[in-house]
Every structure is written in structure tokens, then in C-alpha cells.
């Protein structure tokens, strides 16, 4: 690898070449070359603007743009020679451009610094990544709506403290994840707005003396706004931090969902089955069918949390404006985006294929006194204070534990020993269907409300 100072765009100041190890240590091309498409996009817009400003001739602009497009084709064909001694994606592309067209290629960087160039590239890249991720969230939500509609009448136990609490429908449970993902979607849309601001034109830190027209590049690159301060434009990475924060929340939701899927597929629950294509086996235990997809999503969540804390730590001690520290912003950002996108894709493929074991779910809901609250509410409607009803039902549950009977399995005489207000009509209240159907309000678990919520969800997705 060559380290001759003449290979560097900044070599004029230096009297000896960069140490070979330092060149490798400070280079970022191995990971930032994935920005090539956005780097070329930004350069094409910059060249177009320079021609309008009279810095380039139309012929020079056309020559630069045509060769940048050829360079992109070389990269995508795998024939581009990435050089570590050229440090990063920007200088590799610029050097290749100069190799192809000579002195005209050297004019491209007029009025621009790598500081505003890389900030622009990252924003363009992240904007596209957010769009892909939003599409995967929508696809997962579509799968949840389809499964929720199909399972609107399927009854399962709802849990608090992982203990049986009250009956719910499986469809209602699935829609809880739909709601969380809707907020994740909103957070990313909001993050995209702040990402979609153009720093190009900020140059190194103070702007440029050339008669640039930032409005032109802003429009060409599809940015919503132009950064209002050159120091801020090149130095802050709060948009990347905000993305990692939103990604962390989304991964936290997927991790919680993963935990439920892992539990539900276990022999102890047996609530659902996952198709073989989303599972793997054991190298020693022939009977095993392991839920690797949700387990890996649960595990990968920590990577995204780490990206967030890493970026916060990276930025916390930096003075204005740009510092080399910021070279370390890309790998955690790239990894967070890749992890969230792939996790969503895996879930969007897997969720519609979930096979609920309805009878097992129902049997589980019949255990654990899941209709105890319904009995208390029944007594309230008979005119008793809720706290008294709570205690009465507590005694009934204690009796059930001692006798091995659930509330619905007790006779009327057994129930009446706890309150004379209990009548024959109590048994309609104590059924699983009676329990879920009674919660017939917006946000409730009644099958009718589940179907209504599915329709609202479908309308929401159709409006995106």
C-alpha cells in the first residue's frame, strides 16, 4: 500500500508520508464505501449548482456528471478499486474521477469540504434507510391485522406478572403490538423530518466564499430545508442519535414480542406453532425445534441499544465544529439501521405464518381464576361497594384453590356461601365468552371491538 503524501488531497502541508499503520488506522473506506451512491448523488447536485453559479462551464459539468455515473456503474459491477491510502469513500471517488478526466475532476470539490460532504451523505443515506424501515413496519402491521382479524374470537389468558389475569382474545393481544409499531412508525417519520435538512454548502465550518446557491442543491437532493448554521451543519449528529433512539424503542418492542413468542412456543405454554422455516434444530437433541428468529431479534436488540449509547458517548465531549471522532459515527449507525430493518423483515415474514393452538389457549384461560374480576364487577352491579366485592371474591378464590375448582366450576350454593347477592345469572358472567364480550368499548377485548380496531388499522395503513 502506498503512503506517498502526493496521494493525499491535503499532502501539500506535509513533508513526509503518513505512517503505514496510521494510514490504515485512520482510513474509513472499508465501512463508509456503502455511502457511494449518496456521495455521487451529492456530487452531481453540487456540480450542477457550480455550473449555475458560473464556477464550472456547462461542458465541465456534463463531463463530471457523466463520469460520476460511470464510476457508480464500476462500483456496482464490482470493478472499482477501493484504496485504503485514499482514506474514505469521498476521496476514492474523487481520485477516480480525476484519473478519468484530469484537471476538470479536481474542480468538483470547489466550495465544498469533506465535512459538509459526509454530513450530507449520511443524511441522504439515512433518509433512504428510514423509508425502507417504514415499509417493513407497515408490512409487519399488515400481517398483524390479518392474524388479529382471523383470531378475533380466539380466547387466551391475559397476563400480569406472567400470572393469569383476565381472559382476552388473541386478536386483541396482537393488536397491542400493532399500536406499539404505529408509534414506532410515527417516531421514525418525525426523525426523518429532522434528518432531511441539507448541510451541503457549510463547507469546512464557516461556509464558502464562492457564490453558491444552496437552494439549487437542496431541491435537487430532495431535502426539505437548508441547515441554518454552518457550524451546526457539519458538526452535529443528533439526527443519527435520534434515529438510534427511535430504533431502540422499536427493537425493544420487537424484543418483548419475541419473548412472548419464545414462551408461547415452549412445551410449557404450547399456545402457538411457528413454521419450520423460521426455526432450527439441535446438533445433539433430535426433538428440538428452536424459535431462533425471535431469540435472535431479542438478542440483537442489545446491539441497537449499544449504538445509541455509543453515539451519545461519541458526541458528548466534542467542541465545535468537526472532529475526527465523528468518523466513528457510521458503524454504529449502519449497524443499528441494518439490525432494525432485518429484524422487522424477519417478523413481517413470520407473523402471518403463526399457527395458534386455540384449544390449548382456551384451556389455559379456564385455569387461574381469570374471571375473578368479572365476579367482583357482577357484585358491584348488585349494589355492593367494589372493595367489599374484591374481598368476597378473594375468599371465593381461596376456596377454589383449596378445593381445586375454578369459579365457573363451583355450584350456586358454593358461590352463595360468600355472598347472598349471587344468583343464577352469575354463570353467564363467569364464562370466558361472557368476560371478553362484556368489555365492549373502544380499546376493549370484545371480538366486535377487535374487528372494529382492525378496520381502523387498515384505514391507517391505507392512508400512509
Swiss-Prot record:
Entry EC no(s): 4.3.2.1
Keywords: Amino-acid biosynthesis, Arginine biosynthesis, Cytoplasm, Lyase
Short name of one Pfam family: ASL_C2
GO cellular component: cytosol
Superkingdom, natural source: Bacteria
Location within or outside the cell: Cytoplasm
Biochemical pathway: Amino-acid biosynthesis; L-arginine biosynthesis; L-arginine from L-ornithine and carbamoyl phosphate: step 3/3
UniProt GO BP: arginine biosynthetic process via ornithine; L-arginine biosynthetic process
Key word ATP-binding present: no
Molecular function terms, GO-annotated: argininosuccinate lyase activity
Parts forming coiled coils: none
InterPro entries, alphabetized: Arg_succ_lyase_C, Argininosuccinate_lyase, Fumarase/histidase_N, Fumarate_lyase_CS, Fumarate_lyase_fam, Fumarate_lyase_N, L-Aspartase-like
Catalytic activities: 2-(N(omega)-L-arginino)succinate = fumarate + L-arginine
Annotated family: Belongs to the lyase 1 family. Argininosuccinate lyase subfamily.
Protein name: Argininosuccinate lyase
Organism field: Stutzerimonas stutzeri (strain A1501)
Gene (name only): argH
Amino acid at each position: 500500500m502506498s503512503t506517498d503524501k502526493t496521494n493525499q488531497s491535503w499532502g501539500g502541508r506535509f513533508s513526509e508520508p503518513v505512517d503505514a499503520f496510521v494510514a490504515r488506522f485512520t482510513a474509513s473506506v472499508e465501512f463508509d464505501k456503502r455511502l457511494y451512491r449518496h456521495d455521487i448523488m451529492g456530487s452531481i447536485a453540487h456540480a450542477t449548482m457550480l455550473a449555475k453559479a458560473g464556477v464550472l462551464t456547462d461542458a465541465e459539468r456534463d463531463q463530471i456528471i457523466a463520469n460520476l455515473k460511470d464510476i457508480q456503474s464500476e462500483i456496482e459491477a464490482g470493478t472499482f478499486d477501493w484504496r485504503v491510502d485514499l482514506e474514505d469513500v469521498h476521496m476514492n471517488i474523487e481520485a477516480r474521477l480525476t484519473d478519468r478526466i484530469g484537471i476538470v475532476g479536481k474542480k468538483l470539490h470547489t466550495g465544498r469540504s469533506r465535512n459538509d460532504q459526509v454530513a450530507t451523505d449520511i443524511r441522504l443515506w439515512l433518509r433512504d434507510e428510514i423509508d425502507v424501515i417504514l415499509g417493513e413496519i407497515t408490512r409487519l402491521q399488515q400481517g398483524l391485522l390479518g392474524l388479529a382479524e382471523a383470531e378475533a374470537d380466539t380466547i387466551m389468558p391475559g397476563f400480569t406478572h406472567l400470572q393469569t389475569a383476565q381472559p382476552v382474545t388473541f386478536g386483541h393481544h396482537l393488536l397491542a403490538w400493532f399500536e406499539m409499531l404505529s408509534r414506532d412508525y410515527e417516531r421514525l417519520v418525525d426523525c426523518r423530518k429532522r434528518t432531511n435538512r441539507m448541510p451541503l454548502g457549510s463547507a469546512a465550518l464557516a461556509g464558502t466564499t464562492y457564490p453558491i446557491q444552496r437552494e439549487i442543491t437542496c431541491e435537487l437532493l430532495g431535502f426539505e430545508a437548508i441547515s441554518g448554521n454552518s457550524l451546526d451543519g457539519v458538526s452535529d449528529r443528533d439526527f443519527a442519535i435520534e434515529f438510534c433512539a427511535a430504533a431502540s424503542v422499536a427493537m425493544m418492542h420487537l424484543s418483548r414480542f419475541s419473548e412472548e413468542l419464545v414462551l408461547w412456543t415452549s412445551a410449557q405454554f404450547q399456545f402457538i406453532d411457528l413454521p419450520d422455516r423460521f426455526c432450527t434444530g439441535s446438533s445433539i437433541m433430535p426433538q428440538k425445534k428452536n424459535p431462533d428468529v425471535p431469540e435472535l431479534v431479542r438478542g440483537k436488540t442489545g446491539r441497537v441499544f449499544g449504538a445509541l449509547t455509543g453515539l451519545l458517548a461519541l458526541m458528548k465531549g466534542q467542541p465545535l465544529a468537526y472532529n475526527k471522532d465523528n468518523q466513528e459515527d457510521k458503524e454504529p449507525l449502519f449497524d443499528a439501521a441494518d439490525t432494525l430493518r432485518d429484524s422487522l423483515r424477519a417478523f413481517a415474514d413470520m407473523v402471518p405464518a403463526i399457527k395458534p393452538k386455540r384449544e390449548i389457549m382456551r384451556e389455559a384461560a379456564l385455569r387461574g381464576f381469570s374471571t375473578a374480576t368479572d365476579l367482583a364487577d357482577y357484585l358491584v352491579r348488585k349494589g355492593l361497594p367494589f372493595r367489599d366485592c374484591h374481598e368476597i371474591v378473594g375468599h371465593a378464590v381461596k376456596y377454589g384453590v383449596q378445593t381445586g375448582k375454578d369459579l365457573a366450576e363451583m355450584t350456586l350454593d358454593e358461590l352463595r356461601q360468600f355472598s347472598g347477592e349471587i344468583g343464577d345469572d352469575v354463570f353467564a358472567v363467569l364464562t370466558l365468552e361472557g368476560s371478553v364480550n362484556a368489555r365492549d368499548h373502544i380499546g376493549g377485548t370484545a371480538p366486535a371491538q377487535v374487528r372494529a380496531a382492525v378496520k381502523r388499522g387498515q384505514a391507517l395503513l391505507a392512508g400512509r
